[in-house]
Amino acid sequence: KGGNFSAAHVLDLESFEQVAVWHGLEEPYQFGRILFNMGEFYNCALLAPERNNNGISVIDYLRTNSYPRLYRMQKFDYQVMDETERLGWMTNAHTRPLIIDALKESVRSNSIVLNDADTLAELRTFIRNQKTGKIEAAGGSMDDLVISLAIGCYLRSILPTDFYDGDSDSSYLDKMKERWGQGHTVAVGRGGY
């Protein structure tokens, strides 16, 4: 593969349309800057960067620069017997099936509108491995756009309650109602993201 590319999707929460895509090879802090700018352009969109590998540096950039809406993932910590929250999304053996199933359902039901040719091309090569049974990129293909999209599909299915804005006592919907007087974000030319 030559390394993983960074990938980001902007999905409209109401229409479930893919309205923007970014894909490329960037250093983590530069990708953090790109996400910050994309999120800001799309009305402070909820960002859910992967925590895996260099994703910690991306999250660190966003947190250090006070990006206002970062997804927080809840996890039960058996050492302290309490639930903890961590910024970003962790893709692992337990969470990968969740995001892949959400993506499959979104595509199967035709509820998502995909506009990016590169995303569609990756989806065509994202297949079930006959030996392992795992759904993954076919040999020589990439899946960065697919995994990014799958995370977005899953998070859309569980919104509006799981996000970080510095105040974990309020839900996303309450915050948006407080800020905008309605249940979703609105800006001229850009809907809720």
Predicted regions located by residue number:
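RNase H-like, metal-dependent nuclease domains and their acidic two-metal-ion catalytic environment used
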Residues: 1-87, 93, 97-101, 105-193
